[in-house]
Amino acid sequence: ATMVQFDFSGKVEVLVQKNNGELRSAVVRPLSKGIQPEIDGNFLLFTLDKPQKLSVEFNGDRLNNLHVFANPIIENVPDKNDPNVMYFESGIHEPTDVAGKCFRIPSNTTVYLEGGAVLKGCLTCDSVENVKILGHGMLLEPQQGISVAYSKNVLIDGITVVNSRHYTVSGGQSQGITIKNLKSFSYQGWSDGLDFMSCSDVVIDDVFLRNSDDCIAIYTHRWNYYGDSRNIRVLNS
């Protein structure tokens, strides 16, 4: 499977070329969107007028498809010179924490991944509060994507996580986690999507998960996390 993403407003025409064989038929899912592509030779064309997450499938093949993530344009981009902002520009970034391969996030911090930013490491929120992780950048093959432990008020919005070896997002004994417009792919054993252990007040909204283990799993006590789980909602996903 392959993936493309872009930001837009208004209307956009999407032109797709199949470059590895004859294009006999194509479908754009979810079918509920009612998108009927025009086919011309090995090209297909369709129009979008709002942000969507789509699967373009060729010749009835659901596995070797093209994921199209049409994102809204981000408004109010954080100031990269703000001391409370961790700003990752387009390019490849590796953490200085070589042993854990993690970017550690303090309280009252906004993490912004610019489009084209690729982080080769995990993001860790441990015993913090009031954290935002935003942008249309990517985490690439981290040991774990985003870890939220013993924390409060964490927002994750817009990023893509590709081939995390374990959880894309894990929450442990935390409160007030919101996840929006997240895209996640994984292929290994134990590579869950979103797992929550003893968490409360969690909102999962408008996410796309193609994971090789559980897409979403909810636990009470597990490992060093204690307490019940409550008020966890999954919307538009």
Report residues per predicted region.
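Beta-strand-enriched, solvent-exposed domains that form extended recognition/catalytic surfaces
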Residues: 1-80
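Right-handed parallel beta-helix
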Residues: 108-110, 115, 129-139, 152-163, ...
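Extracellular beta-strand-rich solenoid/capping regions of secreted or surface-exposed proteins
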Residues: 4, 46-48, 93-110, 118-134, ...
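Short, recurring structural edge motifs at helix starts
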Residues: 96-100, 191-193, 220-224
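N-terminal domain-start segments of secreted/luminal proteins
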Residues: 20, 70-109
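Short hydrophobic beta-strand that contains or immediately precedes a catalytic carboxylate
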Residues: 87-88, 112-113, 123
